[in-house]
Amino acid sequence: MEGSGEPQGGAPVNQDVACRVVNGERSEVREFLGREWPKADRRLFGAEVDWTSRPVVVEARAGRELAGVALGEVVAGMARLHDLLVAEGRQGQGVGGRLVELFCARAAELGAARCFLRCPDTDGHRRFYERLGFVLIAKLPRYYHGHDFLEYLREPLIQETGGTS
């Protein structure tokens, strides 16, 4: 019965543990995570880790018009650039490169030492990110909608790139 504490449709692991899918996050799950993650962090990292997500938002404007954005976050000393988008009419003018540089600078202020990102596997994306000091670390076949993506890393986060186009 729902709410009775009995597993519903669960897959037994052993005599006293069963796994099941539940709908939505429950306070009991949040409490479990709050109690168990610090222990797991100490085992793995030797200390507790601050997993607070700190958003990073950078925008480019031409007058009052939004010309581009870089969106991401810093978590546990690592930045992840989730989105970089420049208006079609503003591409090729250095806007994207400047957004990435400002994103990395802000991420460093928030304690990040490196930045990861994923992008489509195209020659243009490769040239753009490699020119900004990112290094290819993984290929992700058929990642989104059957298209290949790439995973890039920039470390150190703040560096001379030789250009920001």
Predicted regions and their residues:
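Conserved acetyl-CoA-binding loop-helix of GNAT-fold acetyltransferases
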Residues: 92-105, 131
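Conserved catalytic-core motifs of GNAT/GCN5-like acyltransferases
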Residues: 116-118, 135-151
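Helix-turn-helix
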Residues: 125
